[in-house]
Structures are given as structure tokens and as C-alpha cells.
Amino acid sequence: MSEKLFKLQGEFIEKFPADFMEAVRRQAGKRNGGVKSMLKFMKRSAKGVRAPHEKATAGMETVRMAVPEEVVIPMSMHIGAPARPVVQKGDQVMAGTRIGEAGGFVSANIYASVSGTVKEVIDSFRMVNGTVCQAVSIVSDGKQRLDPSCKPPAVSDKKGLLEAIAASGLVGLGGAGFPAHVKLAADTIDTLIINGAECEPYLSTDTREMLECSETILSGISAVMKFCGIGRCIIGIEKNKPECIRLLSSLTEQIQGVSVRPLPMRYPQGAEKTLIETCTGREVPQTAASGKAGIPADCGCVVMNVTSVSTLGKYLKTGIPLISKRLTVEGNAVAKPQNIEVPIGTLYRDVI
């Protein structure tokens, strides 16, 4: 019977590693309720796997990288329409100067991450994921002069907050790159979930954000809850980050509607739908009432990465748009593993 079930699972089964399949076979081989036990085991395991953590850099403070000689900033680093370049060769720019205008509602403004001179507007720039888009190459002057237009926005309501977020160029910093102002536009949201799971092996960027920037995390959360009319916020953090859990639990203890939820240590715990179900018990519907694919707002939730909401907090305080990103540089080939903050558009060769 078990072999028949394996064949029925087809490609689904083949994707699992050998040690997992051996565990399934052992479970199916039990005399009492073998097939039922096997199916329960597979359902439980389908919620995630226990991947090695490899978080050697979790205790290392973030180091700011020296300004590179050149950056190449793609106009399509986000989900949605590419931004349109608004500079040309020879233009002088400062850190925070807008160089790309959002190409639609689902798009993002893009800013110079260094001060210097536009070397070239590249028509066909191939990204690491294989996609091709326009990009702006800037030769740095090494001074990191900040554009005087970078001033804290005045926000008094939801419309103003969404406009400020759109102006900042903020997109999801957990990997998806979805424009944040679009995600928060829905009126059906009653629960804000902050994703601090960071379930991927090696990465420690969100861990360092929680430990180093808790103030701006909370100010970003406060702004979203206040202006979007959201009454509940759950900060989800995997249990392998006890220091983060303790810190944010103590800081939110007296904040109404905000709580910290320790999460199971499994991959992909930080996946949006998995996180929503773990934190709230709700499920994102496959199909919304409109007939389109369901989204978190259809079950009353919105998920923001912990670094994304912290970046929002920083923008509301300083007016500096999204121009840098923390990276974890780790692995057997790395002589000095570390967490570094780099200007957007920094080349891999300069990071390594």
C-alpha cells in the first residue's frame, strides 16, 4: 500500500530529500494504522522542515560598508511596473535624489544611493535572476552628500501615510519586493503581522534589525496601526532568536494591541500564508469574492517584514528614502563572515 501511495504522490514525493522519505517509509511500515499515520506525518511535515540554522553572524553587529566607487541601480527591483529613469548621463546626484519614477500604482520610486555623477543610463541590464531592465550607473564622489529634499513627511491620515510610503520607495525587504503602499491600501485589515521569522539558514539581517533598531520598528508599527486603523499587531519571531523575543516582548509589554509570538523553528515559517496561519489561525482563501486569487487582506491580515516596518519608521523620522540594505555575507568561502549595510546597487564583487 505504501508503494502505491508513493506513486500517487508523483513529483510531490520526489521533491523531498532521502532522509525525509525514509522517515515516511518507517511511519507507513507501522502495523497499527500505517497508511493513516503516514498521511498525518506527511501533512505535519508539509508545514515545514527543520533546516540547519547556521546563524554564526547573529551576534555580529552591523558594519557600514565603505562607499563603493560605482553603483548600478536597476529600475525593476520590485514587483510591478519598472520605474522610469528621470536622469541622464552627466547629471549630478546626491544620496536620496530620485533617479527613477514609479511606472504605475504597483511600482516604486527609486533613489540614488550615493552622491556623484550619472555615468550611464543602461537600457538592457541583466539582473542576477535573469530578468532584463533599465538601470542607472553612478560614479561616486565618495562624499555621500544627502539631497536637501530629504525631509520628514507630514502625515495626518491614512492617505498621507500611503503617499509618504510611495514617495519613500519602500518595498518589501524580506525578498518579495512588493510596494508597501499597495499592500497597506486595503480597508479590510484588522491585524498587522510583523515577520521576524528569518527562517532561512545563514541570514541574520532581520535579527540585527530587531536588536539594533527596535525603536524604529516600534515607531513604524505605531504609524501603520494609527493611520490605517489597525487594532492588533503580532510580531512573529522564531524561537531560535531568544534575545530578540525578550527585547521586543519587554518593549511591547505596555503597548496596547501589540504582542510578540514565538514561532516554531521550521522552514518556510516566514512564508506569508504560513505565518498568517501560525499567528492568527486564519487561512488566506484560494479565491477571493472578486474571483481573483486570495490575498492576506481577504482574511483581514497584512504582513510586513520587520526590516521593512523599521525602514518606514526611519523614513518618517528622517525623510531619507530606501537607499541602503543590510546583507549577511556568510559561507565556507567567506574569510570574514559579517553583516554589512551597503548602498543599493553595490556590485557583488565589492561586497565580497
For the regions a language model picked out, list residue spans one by one:
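Conserved hydrophobic positions within beta-strands
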Residues: G116-V118
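Acidic low-complexity segments
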Residues: E120, F125-F178, A186-D187, P242
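Hydrophobic alpha-helical positions that pack around
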Residues: V24, G231-I352
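Short histidine-centered loop motifs in beta-beta connectors
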Residues: A83-Q92, G96
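Short hydrophobic beta/alpha edge segments that flank linear recognition/processing sites
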Residues: V93-S107, I122, C133-V139
